[in-house]
Design a protein with these regions (language model features):
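Conserved PLP-enzyme active-site core in the AAT-like
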Residues: 3-143, 148
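Mobile, glycine-enriched helix-loop/loop "lid" segments at the mouths of ligand-binding/catalytic clefts
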Residues: 88, 92, 194-209
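Conserved small-domain helix->loop->beta segment predominantly found in fold-type I
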Residues: 132-190, 196, 213-222
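Glycine-rich beta-alpha junction loops
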Residues: 48, 70, 119, 134, ...
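Short, solvent-exposed beta-strand edge segments and adjacent coil->beta transition regions
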Residues: 78-80, 167-171, 225-229
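A common structural junction motif
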Residues: 101-102, 189-199, 247-249
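Short, well-ordered beta-strand elements within core beta-sheets of diverse protein domains
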Residues: 113-122, 169-177, 229-233
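PLP-dependent enzyme catalytic core of the Aspartate aminotransferase-like
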Residues: 187, 203-249
């Protein structure tokens, strides 16, 4: 689809991998090659992966952006974001815009993110390990129609994810048997908190169709009504699985 969409007037290609909330995987190197051939620059939102698991600049991206609110901060106590590049010309242009527009984080917000970066590696390993355990549980549960996770060999982007990522992350989505069951499920958990954010040490659960992606309803970008999204934290995997088990009934 990307190749067909590129034209002479394409100036910028904005990508996300894994995508939110369906966890599709984009071949970053192939996408960057195609975009550059069309004369466009490539921006990758790397929030779901974090720099620990994926570094888009190494795969041809020109700019990488992150919500520092998520995995980089890691404790759900900061609001921020950043853009990074390894191109001196782009860096100069971004620096000018930042200075002229005042897009500068407060010193305490910056400190919180720097603090979070110190534990990023150990947290991401825990997120990934817990996610793998939760995926195994969901795969075997009859109340779950389908699990969406790039770490599964059955995932269509699994091989690409293996090439460009150092782990499959802490985000999981799955399809319940119906919208009614999905909505009921997210209200029944006790350890998983019903909330829209992600990437913190605590586990979160949400219904994208009624929460984060409600604005896409009745559009080509609408999420499946029976979709549930999980942000797997670093609590005991046994506790997380037991909570999902009772919520799924």
């Amino acid at each position: 689809m990307l190749f067909r969409s590129l034209g002479d007037d394409t100036a910028l290609v904005w990508l996300e991998s894994p995508t939110n909330p369906l966890l599709n995987i984009i071949d970053l190197r192939a996408a960057a090659h195609a975009a550059h051939a069309a004369g466009a620059i490539v921006v990758v939102d790397n929030t779901f992966a974090s720099p620990y698991l994926q570094r888009p600049l190494e795969h041809g991206a020109d700019i990488v952006v992150h919500s520092t609110t998520k995995y980089l901060g890691g404790h759900s106590d900061v609001v921020g974001g950043f853009a990074a590049t390894n191109d001196d010309g782009i860096a100069e242009r971004l620096g000018f815009l930042q200075n002229s527009l005042g897009a500068v984080p407060g010193p305490f917000d910056a400190w919180l993110v720097l603090r979070g970066c110190k534990t990023l590696g150990v947290r991401m390993r825990a997120h990934c390990e817990n996610a793998a355990r939760v995926v195994d549980f969901l795969q075997a549960d009859e109340a779950v129609d389908r699990v969406l996770y790039p770490g599964l060999p059955s995932h269509p982007g699994h091989e690409i994810a293996r090439r460009q990522m150092d782990g499959f992350g802490g985000m999981i989505s799955f399809l319940a048997r119906s919208e009614r069951e999905a909505v009921a499920l997210v209200a029944r958990t006790k350890i998983w908190t019903l909330a829209e954010s992600l990437g913190g040490v605590e586990s979160l659960i949400e219904h994208p169709g009624k929460m984060t992606h409600a604005s896409t309803a009745d559009s080509p970008f609408a999420t499946p009504p029976n979709l549930v999204r999980l942000s797997v934290g670093i609590e005991s995997a046994d506790d997380l699985i037991a909570d999902l088990d009772q919520a799924l009934g």
